């Protein structure tokens, strides 16, 4: 942990910036401290260390997705309040109240942290331009030039997938509002980032991300890093490119970059090597920066673990049935079964890799479960007083997730057998000894089975997919999406899969002081799939996101209902 702390807790260049009101787009308008000059390759490299964000959208994405249930619904005797008010707002897909720097995991902290990283990357790029006429071909600067561009592309990639629609196609995504793509150092305040000069369509943002990836990816040199896992090393950069092209549906390129990351002999996680003695040992072994499977490690300020153990309101839990006020019976899928404690096509019971790795809330198993890697690190600022900061370690890119990206790309390229082979490599690395076959996949992901929690309603045609999978290929896709859900639980990736495939999500919820259960659904075209721009950013002039949805009336006309409206089909009549 010593190396990790040195690399991810020391913000080597944060004193370079005095954060000015970003119209209040805070981080977008950061100006350099005139007392500091970035005039050497070493200074540029150290500056880029501070460009990696200390926040993650994982908690917001998990709450928005179908990975969590409201325990007040599945355990009727409970009347739990959320750990934080905005957790309930996120679960109900409402606009989230404005929070500033005092609260972790909010839209504001994600927006601020990622745009701050973009500002740092831009300052590094600008400094290199002043140091060399051709930084990309300067042996002292080329590596940092590559890292800065790939990192800038990645930060915009996260922001556009959180605060904008999923990519559909080159035509339809031109009409979807994206985000501000910032490529310049701003030396003035009150810049209007809602101006088309900055705020681009989703399609334009993707084009600019691709430009940054291609500008930088071949220049990255792992030998320049002391600890590569905390930077965009070559494997991490190629894994990012694979995911980017998968989301853009350029499957040839997705396959190419996944192969670059994985190599001829993919080194997936060795779960048997994880020390089982204590929870802390498990987490330390999982996050070991020396493991070949850990492509990129990110430390954040987050209270996601505490949401699971201190509130037991929005949790991973078993499902069940209930009848609403209108007499309609609802089936609530078991999020426990489909994430960290359920069967698969070639294993029964719990996935072997997760055996002994799933923990329950101290109040009892009925109050939810969580996977060991969610456990937080605590950084003491005063050990005697017992105060400090909570950190969550995330791994944005791993070999295990990348091989699932490759399987999906292979499937769309017509190589179903190759996709199944990759899926079998994944199950094998997770301790499954039985072979994976198409017949087993078809049996597990049988869409004709009533209430099959392992399959989801997909709307690929509506989301712009040129190729819509059917039959056996669709079963393999269901398997891939299930494995992705298992692999990335707690990390928010399920939300992005929901967005890109138009997966329908149903949330049932009951307030702490309520007896009535509310039900709401999120269809493929519901604008609430886009998180609202933070209110303080909107107040400063950045346009808010339209999150209203048309509702058909009996006469065939329609009205717009605010996105915060919750349809209550279970009201008394």
Model-flagged regions — what are they?
Residues 25, 234-272, 559, 564-566, ...:
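Aromatic-residue-lined binding/catalytic grooves and analogous aromatic/hydrophobic interfacial grooves
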Residues 2-7, 18-47, 51, 209, ...:
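Bacterial Sec-dependent N-terminal signal peptides
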Residues 255-400, 433-467, 487, 493, ...:
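Hydrophobic-face positions in mid-chain alpha helices that act as interaction patches
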Residues 86-164, 196, 200-204, 213-225, ...:
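Conserved, well-structured interaction surfaces
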Residues 25-75, 324-331, 502-573:
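Membrane-proximal, proline-rich intrinsically disordered regions
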């Amino acid at each position: 942990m010593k190396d990790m702390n040195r690399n991810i807790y020391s913000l080597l260049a944060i004193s370079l910036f005095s954060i000015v009101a970003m119209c209040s787009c805070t981080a977008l308008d950061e100006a350099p401290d005139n007392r500091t000059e970035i005039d050497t390759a070493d200074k540029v490299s150290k500056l880029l260390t501070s460009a990696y964000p200390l926040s993650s959208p994982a908690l917001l994405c998990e709450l928005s997705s179908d990975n969590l249930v409201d325990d007040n619904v599945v355990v009727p005797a409970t009347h739990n309040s959320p750990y934080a008010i905005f957790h309930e707002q996120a679960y109900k897909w409402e606009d989230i109240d404005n929070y500033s720097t005092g609260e972790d995991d909010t839209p504001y902290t994600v927006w601020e942290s990622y745009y701050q990283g973009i500002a740092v990357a831009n300052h590094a790029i600008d400094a290199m331009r002043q140091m060399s006429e051709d930084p990309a071909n300067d042996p002292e600067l080329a590596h940092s030039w590559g890292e800065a561009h790939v990192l800038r592309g990645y930060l915009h990639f996260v922001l556009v997938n959180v605060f904008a629609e999923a990519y559909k196609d080159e035509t339809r995504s031109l009409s979807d509002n994206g985000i501000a793509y910032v490529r310049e150092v701003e030396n003035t305040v009150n810049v209007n980032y809602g101006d088309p000069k900055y705020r681009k369509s989703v399609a334009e943002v993707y084009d600019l991300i691709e430009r940054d990836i291609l500008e930088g990816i071949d220049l990255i040199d792992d030998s320049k890093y002391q600890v590569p896992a905390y930077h965009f090393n070559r494997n991490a950069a190629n894994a990012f490119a694979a995911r980017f092209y998968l989301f853009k549906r350029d499957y040839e390129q997705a396959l190419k970059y996944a192969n670059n990351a994985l190599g001829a002999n993919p080194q997936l996680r060795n779960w048997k090597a994880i020390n089982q003695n204590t929870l802390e040992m498990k987490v330390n072994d999982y996050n070991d920066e020396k493991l070949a499977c850990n492509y990129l490690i990110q430390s954040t300020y987050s209270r996601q673990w505490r949401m699971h153990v201190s509130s037991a309101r929005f949790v991973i839990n078993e499902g069940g049935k209930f009848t609403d006020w209108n007499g309609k019976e609802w089936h609530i899928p078991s999020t426990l079964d489909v994430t960290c404690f359920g069967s698969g096509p070639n294993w029964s019971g719990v996935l072997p890799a997760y055996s002994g790795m799933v923990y329950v809330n101290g109040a009892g198993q009925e109050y939810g479960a969580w996977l060991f890697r969610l456990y937080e690190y605590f950084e003491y600022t005063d050990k005697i007083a017992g105060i400090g900061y909570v950190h969550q370690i995330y791994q944005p890119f791993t070999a295990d997730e990348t091989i699932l990206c490759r399987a999906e790309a292979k499937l769309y390229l017509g190589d179903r057998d190759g996709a199944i082979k990759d899926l079998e490599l994944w199950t094998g690395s997770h301790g499954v000894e039985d072979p994976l076959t198409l017949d087993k996949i078809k049996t597990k992901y049988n869409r004709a089975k009533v209430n099959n929690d392992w399959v989801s309603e997909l709307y690929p045609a509506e989301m712009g997919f040129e190729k819509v999978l059917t039959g056996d290929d669709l079963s393999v896709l269901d398997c891939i999406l299930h494995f992705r859900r298992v692999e990335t639980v707690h990390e928010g990736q399920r939300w992005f899969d929901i967005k890109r495939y138009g997966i329908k999500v149903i949330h049932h919820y009951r307030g702490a002081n309520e007896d009535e259960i509310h039900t709401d659904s999120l269809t493929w075209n519901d604008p609430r799939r886009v998180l609202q721009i933070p209110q303080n950013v909107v107040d400063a002039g950045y346009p808010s996101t339209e999150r209203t949805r048309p509702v058909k009336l009996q006469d065939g006309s329609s009205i717009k209902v605010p996105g915060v409206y919750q349809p209550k089909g279970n009201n008394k009549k």
